[in-house]
């Protein structure tokens, strides 16, 4: 058996020696296949994608065309009616609120108006307290002590009476008009008082002037007469 095997082994060894470069190349190929297994899988995936890509692209294009047709032909399908109605009602409410705010004038609960009062006569102290009652409004004028210096010349003094009032906004014009009327009445009364005082002064002057001529009618002794009387007394 050994003799029979020996020639076979020799032949096989010879064949192996001859096939050594081929074995090396095969081993290299096997090594490359073992190392680059993921590349083959990747290539398979790429092959599948390349194979099915045109069908996927066609499906997407067809779906986009269908959506565009539905959007332009039936836009109500893409918008809910409840949302539209709520949005429109909110817009209308906002517009109505803005118009109301624009129509209503700004409310000032406390207003201060300055009313100039011109006086043509002189006094020492005066206190002004005039409650004014208006329809649905109440206005109170602050009390002020007016100090005016004594003088013979007539001086015009301007006094600003600040009126603090709680007035409803639509009736402010009426209240201001009434305050101005009251100020005009005061001016008229002041003029009448000044006129009466002037008349009184004129009457007093006339009375004094009427008494002065009576005094002038009395005899007035001159210096010479006084000297003669003194001499007569000496002689006696």
UniProtKB/Swiss-Prot annotation:
Q: Where are the transmembrane segments?
A: 52-72
Q: Which UniProt keywords apply?
A: Membrane, Transmembrane, Transmembrane helix
Q: Where is the composition biased (Low complexity)?
A: 196-212
Cellular compartments annotated: Membrane
* Any one annotated GO CC term: membrane
- According to Swiss-Prot or TrEMBL, what is its membrane topology? Single-pass membrane protein
Q: Which residue ranges does the record annotate as region Disordered? A: 183-236
Query: What is the protein's major site of localization?
Result: membrane
Protein name, entry field: Uncharacterized protein 060L
What species does this protein belong to? Answer: Invertebrate iridescent virus 6
């Amino acid at each position: 058996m050994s003799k029979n095997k020996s020639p076979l082994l020799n032949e096989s060894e010879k064949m192996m020696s001859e096939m050594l470069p081929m074995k090396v190349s095969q081993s290299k190929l096997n090594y490359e296949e073992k190392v680059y297994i993921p590349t083959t899988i990747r290539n398979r995936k790429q092959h599948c994608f390349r194979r099915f890509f045109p069908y996927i692209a066609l499906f997407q294009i067809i779906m986009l065309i269908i959506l565009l047709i539905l959007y332009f032909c039936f836009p109500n399908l893409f918008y809910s009616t409840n949302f539209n109605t709520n949005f429109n009602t909110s817009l209308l409410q906002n517009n109505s609120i803005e118009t109301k705010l624009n129509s209503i004038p700004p409310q000032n609960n406390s207003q201060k108006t300055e009313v100039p009062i011109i006086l043509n006569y002189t006094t020492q102290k005066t206190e002004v307290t005039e409650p004014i009652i208006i329809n649905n409004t109440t206005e109170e004028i602050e009390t002020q002590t007016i100090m005016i210096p004594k003088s013979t010349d007539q001086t015009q003094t301007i006094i600003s009476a600040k009126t603090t009032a709680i007035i409803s906004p639509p009736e402010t014009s009426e209240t201001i008009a009434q305050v101005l009327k009251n100020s005009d009445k005061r001016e008229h009364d002041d003029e009448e008082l000044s006129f009466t005082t002037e008349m009184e002064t004129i009457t007093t002057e006339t009375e004094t002037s009427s008494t002065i001529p009576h005094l002038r009618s009395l005899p007035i002794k001159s210096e010479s007469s006084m000297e003669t009387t003194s001499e007569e007394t000496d002689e006696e």
